[in-house]
Amino acid sequence: GIHGIPVTMQQSVYDALAGGALSNYWTFGRDSRDASYYNRVVVGALRAVDFICSLPQYNGKALGVTGSSQGGALSVITAALDSRVTFLAAVHPALCDHEAFFKKRACGWPHYFYYYGAPDEKQLETVRYYDTANFARLLNVPGWFSWGYNDEVCPPTSMYAAYNVISSPKELHPYLETGHYWYQEQWDEWLDWIRRQLNVPM
């Protein structure tokens, strides 16, 4: 996970962290792009690419990133920042179009300004630096995207704000009635596309 914590502990450990030390972690360090919690998270994603590229199993050709929600955002960000990534697949990506709030539109998770009030200039600069839509402009690899129109966590308008600025090859597969979850056929379609990018037999 993004917190650098083993994923094999008892659920009670994660529940305690979510309600305690990691509560509202997305607000940590939001006065500075360098102190932001997401700085370490993004660097960690790039280090993961370093690790994959160091493995003898890696063919040096195809390397994809994929995820949903926060993981979808990190997929876009990682693909935008690291030229070794050759494709991405993002499902209901978060962290999109933070400033939509000021234009009376729905912004994506974590809805900074709904819950935490109007930002000062430093906070505004920081959230711009970690806005998926701003990284989407930098993409130059194929991307597969999917989301639902009933998603209240990552509203579709926020995700369209990122999708619409992508100039590289892209596919959007909306599942209109879904919220912040997947249908099985959506999962199957996502996996088939990834297999094609990797030239893996279906």
Segment roles from a protein language model:
Residues 138-139, 145-147, 151:
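Short beta-strand/loop motif that positions the catalytic acidic residue
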Residues 1-43, 100-107:
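Cap/lid segment of the alpha/beta-hydrolase catalytic domain
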Residues 24-69:
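Gly/Ser-rich "nucleophile elbow"/oxyanion-hole loop immediately N-terminal to the catalytic nucleophile
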Residues 120-135:
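Active-site nucleophile elbow and catalytic-triad environment of alpha/beta-hydrolase enzymes
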Residues 160-202:
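C-terminal catalytic histidine-bearing segment of alpha/beta-hydrolase fold enzymes
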Residues 72-120, 174, 182-185:
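Hydrolase active-site cap/lid region
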Residues 149-154, 180-181:
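Acidic catalytic loop of the alpha/beta-hydrolase fold
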Residues 141, 155-164:
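Short alpha-helix in the alpha/beta-hydrolase fold that links the catalytic acid
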